[in-house]
Curated annotation (Swiss-Prot):
Its EC number is 2.7.7.6. The keyword Nucleotidyltransferase applies. This is DNA-directed RNA polymerase subunit epsilon. RNAP is composed of a core of 2 alpha, a beta and a beta' subunit. The core is associated with a delta subunit, and at least one of epsilon or omega. When a sigma factor is associated with the core the holoenzyme is formed, which can initiate transcription. It comes from the Bacteria. It catalyses: RNA(n) + a ribonucleoside 5'-triphosphate = RNA(n+1) + diphosphate. The gene is rpoY. Belongs to the RNA polymerase subunit epsilon family. It comes from Geobacillus sp. (strain WCH70). It holds the Pfam family RpoY. A non-essential component of RNA polymerase (RNAP).
Amino acid sequence: MIFKVFYQENPDEVPVREKTKTLYIEAESEREVRQKLQGHTMNIEYIQPLEGAHLEYEKKNPDFKVLEI
């Protein structure tokens, strides 16, 4: 399953919506996503599972690239 992760690059700063970034990652569960990203310094705001029409919509985005970890 593909997950969309909303995050802030600097975990020491207060989250600001305008600085929120996203990445896409393949995993079996939200827990696995967190385990894969554990070594990265980021503040994870939300992990959203993508499937069906929502996944197809996201694939049309030119920035859609699944992170390989």
